[in-house]
Amino acid sequence: NITKARLHMDYELSDGEKCIGELEREDKRLAQSVKRISDATGFPMVKLDSAEYFSVGEEMFADMCKELEKAEKYIFAEYFILQNGKFLNTVVDIMAKKAAQGVDVRIMYDDLGSIATYSLADALKLGEKGIKCVPFNPFLFIKSQLNNRDHRKIMVVDLSLIHI
């Protein structure tokens, strides 16, 4: 399942309080909620410069591949599920090419989300291509507590483009 949004972000982190102040003038209750979340997580609010919505994943995929080809510094990705197929194979081919050009390429995937679709051996193969790949939030059968799993699909390219 590919979420259909491309976000261009303004990453002036010092602007967090300024953004909350602007939001407060429009919606005081929402600004209070955002401030609480920002304070609790340590992540400041950032102002969205622009966003593009894709109604179908295929359109987003074509745009994402084009943007990956432009990467100069880094590509960071986080996925709940990794599974070999057209999407991942195409993205990995581009990432491997960029890694060979000196781009820092990293992928994290949820251990449980990918338990039946992606193995540690698959992750090691990415390492051979210059892509740093690690599972996170390992699934432990002996844990009986609730876990903090999400279904994120995030790709950041050179801190200026995010596909969510």
Model feature map: region roles:
Residues 1-162:
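N-terminal localization/anchoring segments of enzymes in phospholipid and broader phosphate metabolism
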